Amino acid sequence: MVEKSEISKAKRVVKRALDLDQNEADTRRGIERVLENVCGLDPLENLSREHAVRGAGETEYVDFTLNIKGEIVMMIEVKRVGLPLALKHLNQLSKYTIDKGCNWALLTNGKQWKLHGISFFAIRTRIVCKRKPSQAYRNS
C-alpha cells in the first residue's frame, strides 16, 4: 500500500521541478524516485535505465524499462517537466515498444502521466495470386 506521505512528497517534487524548470536529466531522476518510492519498484530488479533499442539500423535509448522476472513489460520515456507531452513523443516511444515486443508504454514529464497499451501484429506476407512472371502485370 502506498503511503499518502509518499504521494504528497512526489507532488512536491514535481511542483519544485516545474518551478525550477528542470532539464530532462533532472526530471528523469525525479521520476525514478517516484517509481521507487510511490510505486514500490526495486531499482535493481525492476528498472533498467537507458535501455538500448535498435530501430531502423540506429541504436536509440529508452529512459527506463519495467522488468518483471527478467522480462520487459513496460517502456518508460521521460520528457522535461515543463515540456507538454506530444504525439511525436508517443510515436518515438511506440517505436521502442514495438521493437522490443512490449505492449505497455508510459510517457511522462512528471506532471502528466500517460499509460498506453500498444497493439501490434507480426508482419506477415502471403501470396494472394500466383501467375507466371510474364503474366503478372497483364490485364485479364
Q: What are these model-predicted stretches?
A:
Residues 109:
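Phosphate/diphosphate-binding loops
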Residues 1-104, 112-140:
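A short, conserved, highly charged catalytic patch centered on acidic carboxylates
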